[in-house]
Amino acid sequence: MRRTPAAERLSELGFPPRRGSQEPPFPLGVTRGWGGWPIEKRCEGPRPVPFSERSAEDGREQPAHGSGILWRVRTRLSLCRDPEPPPPPPPLCLLRVSLLCALRAGGRGSRWSEDSARLLLLPPAGASGSLKAERSSSTPYAGRMLESSGCKALKEGVLEKRSDGLLQLWKKKCCILTEEGLLLIPPKQVQHQQQQQQQQQPGQGTAEPSQPSGPAVTSLEPPAKLKELHFSNMKTVDCVERKGKYMYFTVVMAEGKEIDFRCPQDQGWNAEITLQMVQYKNRQAILAVKSTRQKQQHLVQQQPPQTQQIQPQPQQPQIQPQPQPQIQPQPQPQPQPQPQPQQQPQPQQLHSYPHPHPHLYPHPHPHAHSHPHPHPHPHPHQLQHAHQPLHSQPQGHRLLRSTSNSA
């Protein structure tokens, strides 16, 4: 079977004959696409005649064009079909045909074919712009996680932490400063969480409104490598140095552990961490003082009923000694028939005793209960009996003299 030359096939397709070293404007012999769809060709020169309006001799009678014409071919599918409509093609056929034609139309080293193939594989410009807008508008993963737990992110950024290994390399950490501490998250983990969010967002838009609650809860799961430096365990922020474009500082924990950080000088992470730590300590001290005061007030409110029960107890012994002076005045008439001893206290007043005053006036003395007579009158009589052994001899002579005189 003899193969028809390329010039005849080009004339059948409606293109002028080839002259010189000009490349064919379109792959030879391609008249129909995948599934029997007719393919039309366009060029910058005269428009080719459709198949329905073309005769067998039209290709030979067409005028020739100059060799300087540059052909730019683009494939497209016609809107009308043949009288015998073929079955509908699968969805991937359009991409296959357009990609094949774009790669073969411009020749082996054509830049246009590469660009067209690249454009076919890339998403449309509107989709990429919408993704960028979603990324800029959407809050980061860690910030949304903190908001769900009730904390507020005061500052977010990247800090470099010195590793604990032998090499002590600087590793970047995504840091979030809150009112209660500093959160450290590996940057790879944050990127992974953001990718999961972007994958879940288009699924949520097509799903029913009742279904997105499930992925939203799962996306807020805490990361596995999250490290928190709480202000309650933090002691100081020390060793602040500026070298080059970095600022170096050390966070000293309560257990004695030291963690080295560095950041650009214009960010001022050390000042922010110190300020929030001092404010946290002040809040805790105020809460401690308030709690102690509330405990004291609570104890004071419970004490008054107990004091009322204790007060009636000392009143009872005060009532008991009162009937004693009422019963004991009976022996008072006994010293009355002795008039002589009552006249003799005058010479006894000449003697100076070290403590005569406590017995002259009645007052609640601690040894008042030891005396059987709390009344003020029997005190002179008691003084006589108390000092009788000291002056027994002169009193005895006086008594004898008085008896002799009376006799």
Swiss-Prot record:
GO BP term (any one): apoptotic process
The name this protein goes by in its record: Pleckstrin homology-like domain family A member 1
Cellular compartments annotated: Cytoplasm; Cytoplasmic vesicle; Nucleus, Nucleolus
Residue ranges with Pro residues bias: 320-344
Keyword Transit peptide: no
Record keywords, A-Z: Apoptosis, Cytoplasm, Cytoplasmic vesicle, Nucleus, Repeat
PANTHER family associated with the record: PLECKSTRIN HOMOLOGY-LIKE DOMAIN FAMILY A MEMBER 1, PLECKSTRIN HOMOLOGY-LIKE DOMAIN, PQ-RICH PROTEIN
Source organism of the structure: Rattus norvegicus (Rat)
